[in-house]
Amino acid sequence: MGPVRELRVAVTAEDYEEALRFYRDALGLPVIESWENEGGSGAILDAGRATLEVLSRSQTDFVDEIEVGRPSSGPVRFALEVEDSVEAAERLEAAGAEREGGPVVTPWQHRNVRLRAPDGMQLTLFTVLD
């Protein structure tokens, strides 16, 4: 099989145009490729370096408690490192995201803000503190 070359997270959005505007325009992810055909529309956005974080349910609940004050995560949540999590959260809220928690400084010295995107995806915006 060889090593994995790319992690591509596919988000199915009921309102494709709204989701594209949110991730492309508000979050600032540049479009690498897009298409429209008889099957529908799609776009690939550059989200920088990707990692896959696998958590136990108890760890997820621990993070939820810190960020939101209660368990709230589904099976997938985007955690995005940004330069300023508070400013980024405000920009995304103006684009339709709903704040679920934060800002909060975590025990691992990140400033986190939890949001829910218009398509329902949970987002943690985090800034590593010096």
Question: Whereabouts are the PLM-identified features?
Answer:
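Onset of an N-terminal alpha helix
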Residues: E6, A13-Y16
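Short, conserved charged micro-motifs
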Residues: E18, S85-A89
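Vicinal oxygen chelate
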Residues: M1-R8, P30-A79, A89-R116, V128-D130
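Conserved active-site tyrosine of GNAT-family acetyltransferases
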Residues: A19-R24, L92, G120
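Short glycine-/small-residue motifs
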Residues: Q122-L125
